[in-house]
């Protein structure tokens, strides 16, 4: 049976952490997002961003919603006057403020080939890290860049043992793509960076310039609440 295109919508959060609150905040987030039954979005991951590759202290979260209607339901529960913010969610937000000071969010639309949360879990992919690329692309070219990633580049990464976790374009703008890759070991991360300076890596970047204006890669380190963490369990809390 042919695989159905990914029809989900995703919330990507970049969280500014207060002081040494990263571990407590990730645990707080993981307990909400794992095996949830409240109608909210399941958590794909809550990662620590490596300070040597980007801002710190920073946590990145990724949540999966079952399409636009599901997001609308979540917005209704969060913002409408008739319902008010649900008591449990309000309590969660209030407690979270002791560990975070703000953040920046994106709604992401997956490429057809981008795996769902269930597909990531089913493949059993596990890793010590996650390579995140946020690319600025020429207006209107996000889908073409994603198509190239889904063909040539995904195969090249797979040969290195690096599996795709997600490939998305950012909603409400037409100039951004987000890619997430599973890194089995930190040694493979170092190998990836070294190979990027080689013939194949440079050839890919030359090709990508047909669409990409600039990009930024950062290393994300998974917590046990990330579905690709070696110790992840479906019913962990």
Regions found by a protein language model. Give the residues of each.
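An amphipathic, aromatic/His-enriched active-site/gating alpha helix that lines ligand/cofactor pockets
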Residues: 1-5, 23-46, 51-56, 64-107, ...
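Surface-exposed interaction/gating patches
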Residues: 9-24, 110-188, 226-229, 234-237
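The conserved glycine-aromatic submotif of the RRM
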Residues: 52-60, 171-178
